UniProtKB/Swiss-Prot annotation:
Organism: Saccharomyces cerevisiae (strain ATCC 204508 / S288c)
Coiled coil: 435-511
Lineage: Eukaryota, Fungi, Dikarya, Ascomycota, Saccharomycotina
Keyword set, alphabetical order: Coiled coil, Isopeptide bond, Nucleus, Ribonucleoprotein, Ribosome biogenesis, rRNA processing, Ubl conjugation
Acidic residues composition bias: residue spans: 440-450
Description of how the protein assembles with itself and partners: Interacts with SIK1/NOP56 and NOP1. Interacts with the trimethylguanosine synthase TGS1. Component of the ribosomal small subunit (SSU) processome composed of at least 40 protein subunits and snoRNA U3.
Signal peptide span: none
UniProt-annotated stretches for the region Disordered: 423-511
Protein name: Nucleolar protein 58
Amino acid sequence: MAYVLTETSAGYALLKASDKKIYKSSSLIQDLDSSDKVLKEFKIAAFSKFNSAANALEEANSIIEGKVSSQLEKLLEEIKKDKKSTLIVSETKLANAINKLGLNFNVVSDAVTLDIYRAIKEYLPELLPGMSDNDLSKMSLGLAHSIGRHKLKFSADKVDVMIIQAIALLDDLDKELNTYAMRCKEWYGWHFPELAKIVTDSVAYARIILTMGIRSKASETDLSEILPEEIEERVKTAAEVSMGTEITQTDLDNINALAEQIVEFAAYREQLSNYLSARMKAIAPNLTQLVGELVGARLIAHSGSLISLAKSPASTIQILGAEKALFRALKTKHDTPKYGLLYHASLVGQATGKNKGKIARVLAAKAAVSLRYDALAEDRDDSGDIGLESRAKVENRLSQLEGRDLRTTPKVVREAKKVEMTEARAYNADADTAKAASDSESDSDDEEEEKKEKKEKKRKRDDDEDSKDSKKAKKEKKDKKEKKEKKEKKEKKEKKEKKEKKSKKEKKEKK
């Protein structure tokens, strides 16, 4: 007999096929193109209903993973009495798992079986008694949502999409703030040009405009909340002798409107920066401790997600953000870039020019470890201890390269070695006095001088003998060389004579 195992949102269904070799049919699509043909071919043999939505989700996950659950195993044991029966299964993994159970089935799962499943799924409500099309569609929708939630394992605190959008908005805000501030300084500069040189901060400049208005009111206006006392005095003095033109109230109203936008944007930027910092500490605490919130957020945004960044090797993280320079270098066969977005990290910034590349490489390696812990660790805390340890190691390496202590993370306190105290030695005054030389000592000195003279004479004699031997050896070598050369000349002469005789003989024979 041939059975078809069908997984539905309501439960497992075993359909009995009237044709034993239906999976070998060449005209399968034509044989199952209508509901009558499908109902004639398949009859329900057994049905195992799911008890709840949670049970349905559990069984669906086991099918996806290619595992045989206890509920499915019980269903298959009911029909194992039929000898030499064939079981048609949709998933290859599931077919392999059923084979391992040791049941008397010939399990089949190939491309042809997909056509059978296509026909069964189309007319499933008619095959299952007591199940309407509407009920099955509702169950399928609910199960699909459950599987989706299970796969995503959704957690609002761990969504890295928020980081990607926040860092993009932060960059846009910086550009807008710079543009607005430049426009405001140029606009108000016609009325009070000296103010831009005294006050360089854009937000403080905008707040002064909103508080003071026209420059003639500078002496009456209190700017102590915005500026230090010294700079406030300079502003008021410059306002009295300013070379700027006069402006109307309408002009001032429009300038004030722009200044309000700058102050509001600056306040929102600070709020967004705090939000991004909190999000980064929740999602990637170790990366945040190592490279900072902004650099970490830019790395995540550039790669697309925290998971894809965690899967990247250290070499990719090192040059992330410098793709154009990398491909240009490869094309022109020049040196490849040493760093990308990591250049803006504080640790790389502390290094001198020659050491920036080395520190970027070390930092990228540590960042890869921290990222994998942040993204893939099952049980992790948000303290960022691994990031702090990695940062301490990078700082130690930086200190070694720079030759000075650049560590900012707290040092490990170790116990000092115990020092044993010993008694001070007394000074020996007798060591400073020299004894008078005795007669025996003078005699021994004479004997030593005689020995030295004898040694020198012997050494000279040996040197003379060595020089004679070397001359003799050189002469023998020269004689051998001359004899060899004479012998070679003689052999060459004999060969030449033989060759000439041979050639003469050949000529005579030809004649």
